[in-house]
Amino acid sequence: LEILPVIGRLIKEKNGKARAIVSGNQILELKEQDDRPVLMAAFDIGTTTVAGYLLDGKTGEQLATASALNTQTEYGADVIMRANYSLKYGAEELSTCIRKLLRKLIGTLCEAAKKSPEDIYQVSVVGNTCMHHLFLGIVPDSLVHAPYNPAISQGLMFPAEKFHLGIHPGGQLVALPVIAGFVGADTVAC
């Protein structure tokens, strides 16, 4: 809504030449036209490894890739151990841990491509259902007890600033949908 009052003025001042970055039905940015890139990042949060990709948001071209050991391994080597840890202590530590890793990987991706994290307008994340839930800060108790259903299965979109990823302040985070208790968004992405 904060963009709406300036739309008319900006278009008039720039002789109709303005740049709007739109995600779904939301205007993420409106400013005078420039040559700055519109970037996206995608992450596959695996139990062991997190893989990241930096993409040109206009062409879809892959600009850089990076990967790292999932830092949640310090809380348990596998999904069951991490789920049990979160049942006992909550999901906040595990969630913060993986979010910090994504922020670090965003820096690595941008450095490799000689781009700025401020030019990333969307981050998409996938993972098995437990990794999905822990990233979002959801204790996966519904996954460790019958009938082993996810707490949330639909795709979600959030303001990325809530996840402290260090991208454009108006950027979005998209968590792809999961299918079932142990069929996650990583399968949806295939």
Model-derived regions, located:
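A near-ubiquitous, low-amplitude feature marking generic local secondary-structure context
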Residues: G60, A66, Y85, G170-P177
